[in-house]
Amino acid sequence: MALNLMAKKAVVAQVNLLARVSVSIGVAEYCGLTVEQMTNLRSSAIDADVVLRVVKNSLAKRALVSTKCECVLPVLSGPVILGFSQQDLGAVARVFKNFIKENKDLVVKGLGVSGEFVESNQLKRIADLPTRDQAISIIMALMLAPVEKLARTLIEVPMKVTRVVEAVCDQKKS
């Protein structure tokens, strides 16, 4: 169905807004996917807070110009689906990677992470990045480790003295 000019402008505005607020974008060719597979991809994307859009390439190119997602413009050809993540850098890559495990028909053409183009062969590396919450917990554990070690060391000195005194008392009783 052909879109009229107003509808095209609305699509460009929506995709442009998504591109401006997103931290990562993924481009994948969906040729050969069934409706059921596409529905599964969309539901897994929703679970991961990823927005998927199928847009005509000419409209997508207009929408992505002058945004940090502009780096994926060279791979916009053929029937592609765009995935946008607004918070997690690796979310789009994780959605595509998990979907490809069961459906080989989805072909990732490239990713844009913080304005940098990432080749599709680096999908696994980007997908394995920790989420924001995981990264915070790792940093907190690293920051907490020296404090815990200091606390254990400070507690151990009086405990050693107590054990020595107990041993001396036991020795004198015998």
From Swiss-Prot:
Single GO MF descriptor: large ribosomal subunit rRNA binding
Q: Name one GO cellular component term.
A: ribosome
**Per the UniProt entry, what species is this protein from, by scientific name?**
Vesicomyosocius okutanii subsp. Calyptogena okutanii (strain HA)
- Quaternary structure note: Part of the ribosomal stalk of the 50S ribosomal subunit. The N-terminus interacts with L11 and the large rRNA to form the base of the stalk. The C-terminus forms an elongated spine to which L12 dimers bind in a sequential fashion forming a multimeric L10(L12)X complex.
List residues traversing the bilayer. none
Q: Which gene encodes it?
A: rplJ
| Family that this chain belongs to | Belongs to the universal ribosomal protein uL10 family.
Query: What InterPro entries would the database entry show?
Result: Ribosomal_uL10, Ribosomal_uL10-like_sf, Ribosomal_uL10_bac, Ribosomal_uL10_bac_type
What is its biological role?
Forms part of the ribosomal stalk, playing a central role in the interaction of the ribosome with GTP-bound translation factors.
Keywords, ordered alphabetically: Ribonucleoprotein, Ribosomal protein, RNA-binding, rRNA-binding
Q: What is the protein name for this chain?
A: Large ribosomal subunit protein uL10
Q: Name one GO biological process term.
A: translation
Q: HAMAP family from the entry?
A: Ribosomal_uL10 (MF_00362)
